[in-house]
Amino acid sequence: DPQLVARLLASGKNVVTPLNWFYPGKRDVSALEQACEAGNSTLHGTGIHPGGITERFPLMISALSSAITHVRAEEFSDIRTYGAPAVISDIMLFGKTPEEAAASPMVHFLGQGFQQSMEMVAAEMGFAVDAKVISGHEVAVATAPIDSPIGIIEPGLVAAQRFSWQHTVRGVRGIIVMGFESA
């Protein structure tokens, strides 16, 4: 919530968050800048994927290449070892029906950060990306019972998900792709 963050900043509290705000690009951040000035505070957006490795590896590795035609960064995670059952069940919607998972807010929620990652990579590598971001969400269901931190995921219920976002360049897909896959 940008207004809540602005209030915290204006009150003099520094804010460090893994939720967005690591590459504002062309977004209007004047309210946040004013709040930082008023509170003599700072806002630091960071993360691993996105907000860290997603951008830094492609940019770092690009120095070893003479021409870059596309960039793809993906994260894979195994929920069987993820220590946050409420996140797995209530937010990521594992163990739910495919229809329930299709209504997940995760595409939008995660997409805000991944879009910033794509914009940073595009800007630094000189790609002139189109304004539209194409997002995707695929689910796979268990074919056998799977033991997980939320209990057994029964056959027919969501056991894997793939979220993806991509920027097109002059209408061409697959130039800059970011993804998050968990199973």
State where each predicted segment sits.
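Active-site-lining helix/loop region of Rossmann-like oxidoreductase modules
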Residues: 63-183
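Conserved active-site and cofactor/substrate-binding residues in soluble primary-metabolism enzymes
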Residues: 3, 27, 31, 48-52, ...
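Rossmann-fold NAD(P)-binding glycine/threonine-rich loop
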Residues: 6-14, 19-42
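Short Gly/Thr/Asp-enriched flexible loops that form oxyanion-binding sites at enzyme active sites
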Residues: 4-5, 60
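Gly/Ser/Thr-rich loops at beta-strand to alpha-helix junctions
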Residues: 21-25, 47-54, 78
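General beta-strand structural signal in soluble alpha/beta enzymes
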Residues: 17, 43-46, 72-73
